[in-house]
């Protein structure tokens, strides 16, 4: 196989993977679970230090299997019941009795959570204590990327600089562009990319769960009620918005089902998957074409997001939906040029959406960006595109660079202000 394509598949396998619950509190649960394996016994006290962005994205979201919100329960649950071998599915097997045990630690004032100053956007340091024993695990640069382990102050593991610098772009040093992604998705042997169909299965189950039960703001179920009442129609646009939002409803509401995530975000994995799957159903395409479209969507989203930090004041569902829209054009038989039009259109439409933490209303943001994806792919099929207006350049690659520049140079103070507001 083309060595470059092997690199693309490696990227996908690295950052498109199942995640149970919002990945920021789950990072704390994972760190706690790893620390517990070092400590060897149930901790008497837990200390958690996190970056501002990880704190922001943990304040308002349910931790799966617990029915509770926040970093304290995530860390306590990880220490009591976490499976350190399960990565982002660390809490998959937690029981009600273990949740109660974790809550007892919190109620006794034995779980402390605080923000810490760090250059890393994803940072979590968990310390467990039991008697004279102490275990520390530090995560840095990625939700499950361990930078350091210590037992009773002695180093057990320290990652080298190259391994721990994951906050840098995952695409650094790789020849990648929208054009090369499009070509790869079209030409790579099908048997090499069948794995991406798991995204359809996992995120589809989350959508079904969100439609069946009252999670969060019930955005998906509310739209279903509107369809049943004849207020809105059940066309492709509304189905995509409804079912994408329903999956996010379930995820943000603590459903005990994993999402297939994209670059550390379950919601963005949902946004990269469900609109593409529903469009494939609408056009009655083959499983192979669906897989190629999902590769286009997920890898396209990863590439665009590699131009800015993994956590910021920018809602990544925007550019994820841009990549989904690109894939939707491909499904509908459009050209590469029209796929680029779709990306331009989505970014022009909804790039002003901010991230003010993970919470139930993320389902509304997912639905907003997904609706933009539908409008944009329809416009693109009609060869209508935004070009040379505002931050949208005449070339899609330049537009992507502009987005990165806007976030890196223009939104850092916005992020500080948002976190300050949320912490007041």
Curated annotation (Swiss-Prot):
Family label: Belongs to the UPF0597 family.
HAMAP family listed in its UniProt record: UPF0597
The organism's place on the tree of life at top rank: Bacteria
GO biological process: L-cysteine catabolic process to pyruvate
Protein name: UPF0597 protein Sputw3181_2955
Annotated GO MF terms: L-cysteine desulfhydrase activity
Organismal lineage: Bacteria, Pseudomonadati, Pseudomonadota, Gammaproteobacteria, Alteromonadales
